[in-house]
């Protein structure tokens, strides 16, 4: 958006250099989040995302799925479809079509949530719920289908759109914690099944209106799987970032000013 002002935008630095400098900034000294607060974080994130769901004309007429944090020792797949082949990697959250719920794996979420900085812990929970809600909007996956990078990236992108439409974006005026959550969602060894860390980060930023990719459509995300995006320099910059658990700092001023929200008549999350 021409003329928009963004916080911490370093005018003398090109986009990619600014992004690296800001994201390479050391972590703050805040105390790690407590795993005991996980249930409260799920409740808070769900309430915020529900508002975004109701505000978006593409989802307002659809029932909002219930969100359930599973008890210890219960997995998402074991609860939703125990007869299907095991998904590798196991998701921390997913939409269960048979019950119409978003299911969250308590054990897979507790450890990263408990050891994270508070803002990153909240972003982790919000990211997983948002992407699982976005799965509700995608065509049903074939019975017993394994992980699919295209589907993962579409859900990540549409989850970003949902985040941008909800009060959750005000909880993260700096989008860096959300980018960390997207990049750290799966281990690098699973990249062929779920997309690389940089692809997930780019997909999330696309949903937030911060890339040159214009939509979350299958064709756009298929191009991302191949690395054929309009702004390859940004994708390359995300690839150069340090491991997600060390990527702290301000992201807002580093993303290009051509912010184009994917929801009509809604400001980008990065706009002041």
Give the residues covered by each predicted segment.
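Short pre-active-site segment immediately N-terminal to the catalytic Zn-binding motif
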Residues: 110-127
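Bacterial N-terminal signal peptides
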Residues: 14-27
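Catalytic zinc-binding patch centered on the HExxH motif and its immediate surroundings
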Residues: 72-103
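Short helix/loop segments within enzyme catalytic domains
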Residues: 40-64, 150-190
């Amino acid at each position: 958006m021409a003329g928009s002002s963004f916080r911490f935008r370093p005018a003398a630095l090109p986009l990619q250099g600014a992004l690296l400098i800001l994201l390479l900034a050391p972590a703050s000294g805040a105390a790690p989040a407590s795993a005991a607060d996980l249930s409260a974080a799920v409740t808070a994130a769900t309430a915020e995302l529900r508002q975004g769901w109701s505000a978006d004309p593409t989802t307002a007429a659809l029932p909002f799925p219930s969100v359930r944090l599973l008890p210890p020792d219960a997995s998402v797949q074991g609860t939703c479809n125990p007869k299907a082949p095991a998904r590798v990697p196991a998701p921390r959250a997913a939409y269960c079509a048979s019950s119409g719920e978003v299911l969250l794996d308590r054990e897979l979420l507790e450890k990263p949530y408990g050891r994270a900085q508070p803002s990153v812990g909240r972003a982790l929970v919000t990211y997983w719920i948002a992407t699982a809600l976005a799965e509700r909007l995608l065509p049903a996956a074939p019975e017993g289908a394994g992980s699919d990078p295209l589907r993962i990236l579409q859900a990540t992108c549409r989850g970003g759109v949902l985040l941008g439409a909800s009060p959750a974006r005000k909880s993260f005026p700096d989008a860096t914690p959300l980018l960390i959550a997207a990049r750290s969602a799966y281990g690098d060894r699973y990249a062929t099944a779920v997309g690389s860390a940089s692809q997930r980060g780019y997909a999330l930023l696309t949903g937030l209106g911060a890339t040159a990719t214009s939509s979350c459509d299958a064709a756009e995300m298929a191009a991302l799987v191949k690395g054929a995006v309009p702004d390859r320099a940004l994708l390359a910059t995300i690839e150069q970032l340090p491991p997600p658990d060390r990527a702290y700092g301000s992201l807002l001023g580093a993303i290009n000013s051509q912010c184009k929200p994917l929801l009509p008549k809604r400001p980008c999350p990065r706009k002041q």
